[in-house]
């Protein structure tokens, strides 16, 4: 049986922590074992890669920045102990929580198979839940505005951040189903845009749970593309986007 050296154990754990800081759920999943168990002790554990990703996505996707500062660490065999301050910036404010985590690594897959985090979850929830409630109750126009700002910055992870895990982005001839597929699509946008600029019209609210925005891509040399995006939003996350083109796709 292959066993991890302490340095390899640290490397695997810290790759997961870096993925969490990136807010890219695809990277997070890359370092989670399919049968991973994540427990915020003494609360019941979350079982399996998909469920753990959903647990983390609740706060990662609404964070503009994430930083998990390591205060101290130790490793032995396939186990690592990490004292941290987990820091999240949401809605313009920083929210931090002290954690002591015990991480276990699967040597065969080089993935994290178990996390036991010791944290005052009650105190953390008392501070974070009002923020999460406010973000979940935003009208569609506010959610879409945050997404459009990410498009202007050409930040693919931020572009995907406001989509639900099971959202669908529907463009002419193709639909992208699920957060990872949508993020993969947004990864291609900066290269495809090149030096072109996306110009958005005013966001048109269609009730509390839908919004529509017309856009135009102005490319050097006079070429242009245009269309309309209609967004459906539930609990602060985009669940469906329909893109209608007025010309060829960019």
State the predicted function of each range:
Residues 1-34, 123-161, 165, 250:
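Short, low-complexity N-terminal intrinsically disordered segments enriched in polar/charged residues
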Residues 3, 15, 39-42, 90, ...:
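A general structural-boundary detector
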Residues 7, 18, 25-78, 156-209:
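A solvent-exposed, acidic/Ser-Thr-rich amphipathic alpha-helical stretch
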Residues 60-139, 143, 170, 183-250:
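A beta-strand edge to alpha-helix "cap/lid" segment located at domain peripheries
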